[in-house]
């Protein structure tokens, strides 16, 4: 069984011009699933009905208390989010699906995609488990990625990523996450 420590190398190896080990029909199944997930995400963004925010989600758990209160109690709706920002969010979903597709084709075990979890009554959807390790997929600019690469996210986490994945880890009763 593959280990998450080799995930990046194994994904790069898919594109090295060496034949991959997975049968082409199996690859097609994974690609079909990927296509279906893209369809779900794209349609959700194109046909989403205007609604107001009004509930706390685990994805917001690391934000400052005051910002959380405002987000939950304001009358702001999804209509207030610019089209360019909505496309940026969609791009993140597409990249997440691509990462999980590549992980699967590279022979890693991908499970529990978008599994709903609850911590202290607050719901959320984790991204996935890869090789039995909780994984939260993040897309970032090269500037923002420095925090991950230089391992300084613990000191500077403006989006609350650590709190978010910690909540998912608590819901799954696991100690290891990536």
Q: Model segments located where?
A:
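Metal-dependent nuclease catalytic cores that hydrolyze phosphodiester bonds in DNA/RNA
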Residues: 1-134, 141-152
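Metal-dependent nuclease catalytic cores in nucleic-acid-processing enzymes
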Residues: 97-106, 154-178
């Amino acid at each position: 069984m593959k280990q998450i420590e080799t995930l990046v190398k194994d994904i790069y190896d898919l594109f090295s011009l060496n034949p991959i080990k997975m049968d082409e029909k199996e690859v097609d199944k994974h690609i079909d699933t990927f296509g279906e997930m893209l369809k779900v995400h794209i349609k959700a963004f194109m046909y989403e009905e205007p609604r107001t925010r009004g509930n706390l989600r685990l994805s917001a758990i690391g934000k400052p208390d005051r910002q959380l209160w405002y987000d939950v109690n304001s009358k702001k709706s999804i209509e207030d989010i610019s089209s360019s920002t909505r496309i940026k969010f969609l791009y993140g979903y597409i990249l997440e699906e691509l990462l999980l597709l590549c992980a699967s084709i590279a022979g890693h075990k991908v499970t529990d995609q978008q599994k709903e979890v609850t911590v202290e009554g607050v719901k959320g959807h984790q991204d996935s488990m890869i090789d039995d390790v909780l994984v939260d997929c993040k897309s970032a600019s090269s500037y923002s990625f420095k925090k991950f690469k230089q391992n300084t996210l613990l000191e500077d986490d403006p989006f609350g990523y650590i709190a978010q994945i910690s909540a998912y880890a608590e819901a799954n009763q696991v100690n290891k996450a990536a």
